[in-house]
């Protein structure tokens, strides 16, 4: 976001805030309204942000959400195809293990609509193409530490797991570490989401598990900044811009492996 603001330095003045919780973001939104912001690009990932975002919109500020769906009238949004990530991950799992087996799905309730949509795409697709698949859900978080801790417990509770539907590469890295630590060989597929060079390297080097990532470009936030500027210029802008996903696995990972890559 800051890179795009710098690129538009002749057109915009900007402030950049990072938030650790809903209360902090609410205070920052108030600060921006006092400052005189005409547009705000926000990532309101916590519950309870509907009213503060609506207040900003009602005061005449253009608000563009990065990825998160919230119940606010007049908000714009640039998003990855979160539901499509779930759809493509479900298809990948079925392609590798068939239409029966046990799949552990790892939703992340704290991520709001991101997790909800990725899970919806996955569960709807599994019901359609593999209705006999046994899907077990365990909540986790988008960190490798949580992936390791939670999946260590999951492995202890489940003697047979055929595939793992993980929503994020960071979680998947922790899951893979838990599998290695436990010496398990039953798991044949692990998905991920986002895309990063460390995970791409694991995809290439791990030949015992089919590992994939549904790409989710961080450059979308730059497009959110561009959308905000376009709205302020009075240009016609669709309220929602969805960026499609791509599956990366062993068959095409070489196209994405690049130590100098600044996107993934």
Language-model-derived ranges and their functions:
Residues 11-34:
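Early extracytoplasmic/lumenal segment of secretory-pathway proteins
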Residues 114, 125-129, 216-264:
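Hinge/cleft segment of the Venus flytrap/periplasmic-binding protein
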Residues 14-16, 39-43, 62-67, 77-79, ...:
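Structural recognition of the beta-strand scaffold that forms the well-ordered cores
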Residues 16-18, 70-94, 105-109, 137, ...:
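Short beta-strand elements at the ligand-binding edges of bilobed clamshell
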Residues 26-34, 38-58, 122, 136, ...:
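Hydrophobic alpha-helical
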Residues 46-84, 88, 102, 196-208, ...:
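Flexible loop/hinge segments that line or gate small-molecule binding clefts
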Residues 25, 78-103, 117, 145-148, ...:
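Hydrophobic alpha-helical segments within soluble ligand-binding/sensing domains
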